[in-house]
């Protein structure tokens, strides 16, 4: 009996045989092999066995399901070759073995199906978070949409938590670095403040020294100025004392002494006035024979009581004449004989004596001290 397979089944069987490695035994014969297989009636499998085999072959394992769900990737295989007849032939030695194989095939397929069922693997964080939220997910796949949303939300929370922890860790490291820099800069600031205080103290000490030096300079300048002024005053006073003495000693022998004459003119009285000036001392001391000589304009020295003497100088004047002039007497007095003022006296002598002329004579009286 020949088993006829369609094109899809033939491709599937060719893929399986290629994976098992039996394809390379007779490549030349496989090309010339016919497509129909001649199997005995006892070796023909039943329909349900073929269905189970195909289901077991077509259903992927759990690991492949998880990988395909996380990262789907489609793999396409092109099968454009024919299968040889010898590759699919089965050589069974006995019927017992064939019966046992037919009896063990369903159990084996169930075990394989149980092993190949996809299981949901959760981490400890996911389990703890689900327990906190009071959610329960099944351990097998596939999951419903709500369960998938719950699982995604839980995983998103875990990712956010990890990212927050990482950001906190980085922030902590950054803050620690800033704190260390702040401590270092504060230490440097304290050192600089100490240096500034030291420099301020040095500046104050230098200012004190400068003030002391300025005070010393001012004192020295005041002392020098006072001493110089004192010396200058002494020199000026010495010069003032020496110059007049030198001038007087030089001029005493060479130049005649100049005497100033202070004159006073008495008012002329008429002859009819009974109160006329009488000079008894003059009448007693001046002789009569020398009256005309004295009246002619000569000088006469009269001794007054005490240490004073009077110089009488007679100058006849007309009634309408001007006051008498002052005459110096350098010949009579070579030395300063008169310490007091020289007073010119103008008087009208009495005519009873007979020695006064008609006119207004003037008399000069000069005091003379006799030491």
From Swiss-Prot:
SMART domains: BRLZ (SM00338)
Residues marked Cleavage (site): 263-264, 266-267
Renumbered residue ranges of the record's region Basic motif: 152-184
Keyword Transferase: no
Ranges spanned by the short sequence motif HCFC1-binding-motif (HBM), renumbered to the chain: 78-81
Induction: Up-regulated upon differentiation of monocytes towards immature dendritic cells (DC). Down-regulated upon DC maturation. Up-regulated by endoplasmic reticulum stress triggered by thapsigargin (Tg) or tunicamycin (Tm). Up-regulated by CCR1-dependent chemokines in an immediate early response and biphasic manner and by NF-kappa-B.
Residue numbers spanned by region Leucine-zipper: 192-213
Name of the protein described by the UniProt record: Cyclic AMP-responsive element-binding protein 3
Gene name, Swiss-Prot/TrEMBL: CREB3
């Amino acid at each position: 009996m020949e088993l006829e397979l369609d094109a899809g089944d033939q491709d599937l069987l060719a893929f399986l045989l290629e994976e098992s490695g039996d394809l390379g035994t007779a490549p030349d014969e496989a090309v010339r092999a016919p497509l129909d297989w001649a199997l005995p009636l006892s070796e023909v499998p039943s329909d349900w066995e073929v269905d189970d085999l195909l289901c077991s072959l077509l259903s992927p394992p759990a690991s492949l399901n998880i990988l395909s769900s996380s990262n789907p990737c489609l793999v396409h295989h092109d099968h454009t070759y024919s299968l040889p007849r010898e590759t699919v032939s089965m050589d069974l030695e006995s019927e017992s073995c064939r019966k046992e194989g037919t009896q063990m095939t369903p159990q084996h397929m169930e075990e394989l199906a149980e092993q190949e069922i996809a299981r949901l693997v959760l981490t400890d964080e996911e389990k703890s978070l689900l327990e906190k939220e009071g959610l329960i997910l099944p351990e097998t796949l596939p999951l419903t949409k709500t369960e998938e949303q719950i699982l995604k939300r839980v995983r998103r929370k875990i990712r956010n938590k990890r990212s927050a922890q990482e950001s906190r860790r980085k922030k902590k490291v950054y803050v620690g670095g800033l704190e260390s820099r702040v401590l270092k800069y504060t230490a440097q600031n304290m050192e600089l403040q100490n240096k500034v205080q030291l420099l301020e103290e040095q500046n104050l000490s230098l200012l004190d020294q400068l003030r002391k030096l300025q005070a010393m300079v001012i004192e020295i300048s005041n002392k020098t100025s006072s001493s110089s002024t004192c010396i200058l005053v002494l020199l000026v006073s010495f010069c003032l004392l020496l110059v007049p003495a030198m001038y007087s000693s030089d001029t005493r022998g060479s130049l005649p002494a100049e005497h100033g004459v202070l004159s006073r003119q008495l008012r002329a009285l008429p002859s009819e006035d009974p109160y006329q000036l009488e000079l008894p001392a003059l009448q007693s001391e001046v002789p009569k024979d020398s009256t005309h000589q004295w009246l002619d304009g000569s000088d006469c020295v009269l001794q007054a009581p005490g240490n004073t003497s009077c110089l009488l100088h007679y100058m006849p004047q007309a009634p309408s004449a001007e006051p008498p002039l002052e005459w110096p007497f350098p010949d009579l007095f070579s030395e300063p004989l008169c310490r007091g003022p020289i007073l010119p006296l103008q008087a009208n002598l009495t005519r009873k004596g007979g020695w006064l002329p008609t006119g207004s004579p003037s008399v000069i009286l000069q005091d003379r001290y006799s030491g």
